[in-house]
Structures are given as C-alpha cells and as structure tokens.
C-alpha cells in the first residue's frame, strides 16, 4: 500500500553533520525509525543519491555514522533510508524510542 511505512517513526531533535558528494552541511533532525530518518536542510539532495550522516540521538549516545540513500525531498525536508546502520546503533535508536514513549506517558 502506498504511504505505509516499514517501521514506526518517532520525533528526534539533534544536529546532523552531512556529506553528500562535494557538499558538506549541517541539518536538523525531524523524525527517525529503525530504517531511516528525515531532517531539515537548505541543501538540495537528488533523490536516489547517497550521503553520509554523523549524529547523536542524545548527548550521552555515541556518535552514529551511517550511509544513507535519499528517498525524498519536499522543500527543506529530506527523507533518507539507512543503508549500513550497525546493530549497536539500532540498539541506541530503540532506547531513544523507549525514552520518547516514556516521555509521552507523563
């Protein structure tokens, strides 16, 4: 079904350092899942191009470096799919999801 996501997304706010070809730029995260994320940037990224993202879901998390595939860009919002997210980084994302869920119950 079109529009159905492979996994649930949840909000995340962190700074992202990006490299796409010759471009190096900053972005602000918007939401994330175990399969990808979206972020806001002024950079123009072609759909189906690859980029490298560096970010920390929380200040106490290790730096995550992941190769991504650009799936969409509408205005300043870019959607990407993770291509090589390591298992331990997926665990940090699951903990982030649990923090978001716990914060929503208060």
Regions found by a protein language model. Give the residues of each.
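N-terminal helix initiation/capping motif
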Residues: 1-32, 47, 94-106
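Short, conserved beta-turn/loop elements at beta-strand boundaries and strand-helix junctions
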Residues: 21, 34, 73-78
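Short conserved beta-strand and strand-loop elements enriched in small hydrophobics
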Residues: 14-18, 49-61
């Amino acid at each position: 079904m079109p529009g159905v996501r492979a996994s649930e997304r949840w909000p995340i706010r962190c700074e992202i350092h990006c490299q796409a070809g010759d471009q190096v730029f900053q972005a602000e995260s918007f939401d994330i899942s175990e399969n990808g994320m979206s972020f806001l940037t002024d950079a123009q990224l072609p759909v189906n191009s690859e980029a490298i993202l560096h970010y920390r879901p929380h200040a106490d998390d290790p730096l995550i470096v992941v190769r991504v595939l650009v799936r969409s860009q509408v205005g300043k919002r870019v959607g990407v799919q993770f291509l090589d997210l390591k298992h331990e980084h997926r665990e940090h994302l699951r903990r982030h999801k649990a923090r978001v869920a716990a914060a929503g119950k208060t």
